[in-house]
């Protein structure tokens, strides 16, 4: 009878067993969360060195303390001494297990999901801090690249609000339309240089003076005489070379001037015509008079 009473006290009904399983599941979830948190605290981000501030962000995610056994109450109905009989009373099925909202405004009922979200949020803050450092480093090397512009582009690409970075707070109007700007540079149309109008060159008719014609004729006669004398000399030299041990070549005969060249040149006379109009007004015609008279052939008719 004593043994039967002990078994009866320890036995749990099916209804209470369901509540007990729920309690065990809660303890299991807390232990699993603790393992995940320890793993996340030991994580090393490739390419990033965690600072003391960043480590503090990761250490802020505290776990819910496991419920103590002091909540387990003894009904006091057992007649068996406490040293031999253990009475297990599961939590009341009507009591709701309250989970404190220690993870901000994350709207979820899964405690594990809340914890993971908090850790990922801390990691995101670390990434953003590294992005800010990188932007400042680029700006130090290239002052023409603004830090705010780089951060604004980063927020747009990652679909994040500009308020993610404190440096961009209150500047939404400036950077909200950053995607609406034209990516392609404006094409600069080069204007063709104006064409220069070619000036028409009017050639003035050159007046051939009578004295120039006489000089050309005299030069032509002299050139013809020179050619004749040079041909005669060549014939003589060729005949002298045929005879061996011939006498020295005699000096060439003096050049004979043509009869036209022997003629004495008559004294030249200039035209006596005076210009009255035009650019030569007040000057006298310089054309040489050919033949008799005091006027050239051009002004002879006007002098009559």
From Swiss-Prot:
Disulphide bridges, residue numbers: none
Compositionally biased region (Polar residues): 61-76
Compositional bias (Acidic residues): 209-233
Source superkingdom: Viruses
Basic residues biased stretches: 192-203, 248-260
Region feature (Disordered): 61-82, 178-275
Biased composition (Basic and acidic residues): 234-247, 261-272
Protein name, per record: Uncharacterized protein 411L
Record organism: Invertebrate iridescent virus 6
Lineage: Viruses, Varidnaviria, Bamfordvirae, Nucleocytoviricota, Megaviricetes
């Amino acid at each position: 009878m004593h043994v039967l009473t002990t078994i009866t006290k320890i036995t749990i009904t099916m209804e209470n067993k369901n509540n007990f399983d729920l309690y065990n599941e809660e303890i299991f979830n807390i232990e699993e969360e603790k393992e995940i948190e320890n793993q996340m605290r030991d994580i090393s981000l490739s390419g990033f060195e965690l600072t003391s501030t960043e480590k503090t962000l990761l250490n802020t995610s505290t776990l819910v303390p496991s419920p103590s056994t002091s909540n387990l109450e003894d009904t006091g109905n057992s007649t068996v001494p406490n040293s031999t009989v253990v009475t297990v009373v599961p939590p009341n099925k009507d009591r709701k297990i309250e989970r404190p909202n220690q993870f901000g405004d994350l709207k979820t009922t899964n405690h594990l999901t809340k914890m993971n979200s908090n850790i990922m949020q801390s990691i995101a803050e670390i990434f953003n801090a590294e992005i800010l450092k990188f932007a400042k480093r680029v700006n130090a090397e290239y002052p023409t690249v603004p830090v705010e512009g780089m951060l604004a582009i980063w927020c747009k690409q990652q679909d994040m609000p500009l308020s993610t970075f404190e440096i961009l707070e209150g500047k939404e109007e400036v950077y909200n339309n950053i995607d609406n700007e034209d990516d392609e540079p404006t094409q600069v149309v080069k204007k063709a240089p104006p064409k220069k109008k070619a000036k028409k060159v009017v050639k003035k008719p050159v007046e051939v003076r009578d004295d120039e014609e006489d000089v050309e004729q005299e030069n032509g006669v002299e050139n013809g005489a020179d050619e004749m004398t040079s041909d005669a000399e060549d014939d003589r030299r060729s005949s002298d070379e045929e005879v061996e041990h011939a006498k020295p070549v005699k000096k060439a005969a003096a050049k004979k001037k043509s009869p036209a060249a022997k003629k004495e040149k008559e004294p030249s006379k200039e035209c006596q015509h005076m210009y009255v109009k035009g650019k030569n007004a007040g000057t006298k015609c310089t054309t040489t008079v050919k033949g008799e008279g005091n006027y050239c052939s051009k002004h002879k008719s006007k002098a009559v």
